[in-house]
Swiss-Prot record:
Similarity annotation: Belongs to the radical SAM superfamily. Biotin synthase family.
Organism: Prochlorococcus marinus (strain MIT 9211)
Assembly and interaction partners: Homodimer.
Positions contributing to [2Fe-2S] cluster binding: 110, 142, 202, 274
Cofactor binding: number and manner: Binds 1 [4Fe-4S] cluster. The cluster is coordinated with 3 cysteines and an exchangeable S-adenosyl-L-methionine.
GO biological process: biotin biosynthetic process
Pathway per the UniProt entry: Cofactor biosynthesis; biotin biosynthesis; biotin from 7,8-diaminononanoate: step 2/2
Protein name: Biotin synthase
Keywords: 2Fe-2S, 4Fe-4S, Biotin biosynthesis, Iron, Iron-sulfur, Metal-binding, S-adenosyl-L-methionine, Transferase
Length: 332
């Protein structure tokens, strides 16, 4: 058993492990809810004693026209979703939106490009300028743009990129049911390139894709056995978009999201566990349970790429109800 002890603020220890077995993860997911929440709470109170929640804002810089065939995604050219593709935002407009997000309380700005991989040339040079500009605002900068080369990863690191997002989406076993134009191994190799360049990883998955509990356990096992653990672990609930192969799938039971968050918190004590897409269908009560279970970041703003998100004022009220600390309350 590989253990690394992390001494928290009150001098108690949290153990970091990178050798979780499938049966251990599956057992956690299946624990009685009260016991699972208790275990997650004990970890979360040690590693985040002030109950701070990071607010991350997400902007789609390049929307639509993606060559990948992800079954859940409205931006794929293989799907018939009714979205409008448009040219990339200019650098100045992106930085203007980043400043607006910061003024609203966000301290992380994430930028997305609907690409299979990063293209060299002017689009990439603009991306680097955006990263530098976001960092100059005093914000964390995250990019999601598909696969990349070693040199591109190094240049993003030199520009000051905080994290690169590249989700695994689902388990290795279920992956071919969701996407066929990129292999699971290619996703892993992309994450390795990012880490080798000195950029932290933002990687997680989606529940509600028709996967089994075993698939969820397998996904979490892959994430939890990365060493070090990802800096951020986004947990998404499927937003079934018309025109995609998964358009008729039902919404998840919100308690399933609570279980995923709690298990991720136990497995990866120091990672940010981010409530991502699908929050609107959870309701306030389930989201507050997710904060209790260990979620310490949300995507904040009215839109996530091409799907809706709770309004800023609604999120302010939610976070106030939950009694957590956020960026604006820390500086008031």
């Amino acid at each position: 058993m590989t253990l690394i002890n992390y001494k928290a603020a009150d001098q108690k220890e949290v153990q970091l492990r990178y050798d979780w077995s499938f049966s251990e993860v599956e057992s956690l997911l299946q624990k009685p809810l009260m016991d699972l929440l208790w275990d997650a709470q004990r970890v979360h109170r040690l590693t985040n004693p002030g109950y701070k929640v990071q607010l991350a804002s997400l902007l789609s810089v390049k929307t639509g026209g993606c060559e990948e065939d992800c079954a859940y995604c409205s931006q794929s050219i293989h799907n018939s979703s009714d979205i409008t593709s448009y040219s990339d935002f200019e650098v100045e407009e992106v930085l203007k939106r980043a400043k607006t997000a910061k003024d609203a309380g966000a301290d992380r700005f994430c930028m997305g490009w609907a690409w299979r991989e990063i293209r060299d040339g002017q689009p990439f040079e603009s991306m680097l300028k955006m990263v530098r500009g976001v960092r100059d605002l005093g914000m964390e900068a995250c990019v999601t743009a598909g696969m990349l080369t070693d040199n591109q990863a190094l240049r993003l690191a030199e520009a000051g990129l905080t994290a690169y997002n590249h989700n695994l989406d689902t388990s290795p076993e279920n992956y071919d049911q969701i996407i066929t134009t990129r292999t699971y191994q290619e996703r892993i190799e992309t994450l390795e390139r990012v880490r080798s360049a000195g950029i932290t990883l933002c990687t997680g998955g989606i529940i509600g894709l028709g996967e089994s509990l075993k698939d969820r356990a397998s996904l979490l096992k892959v994430l939890a056995n990365m060493s070090p653990h990802p800096e951020s672990v986004p947990i998404n609930a499927l937003v079934a978009v018309e025109g995609t192969p998964l358009q008729d799938l039902p919404s998840i039971d919100p308690i399933e999201m609570v279980r995923m968050v709690a298990t991720a918190r136990i497995l990866m004590p120091l990672s940010r566990v981010r409530l991502s897409a699908g929050r609107e269908q959870l309701g306030d009560e389930a989201q507050i349970l997710c904060f209790l279970a260990g979620a310490d970041s949300i995507f904040y703003g009215d839109t996530l790429l091409t799907t809706s998100n709770p309004a800023i004022q609604a999120d302010r009220e939610l976070l106030s109800k939950a009694g957590v600390q956020v960026n604006w309350s820390l500086h008031e």
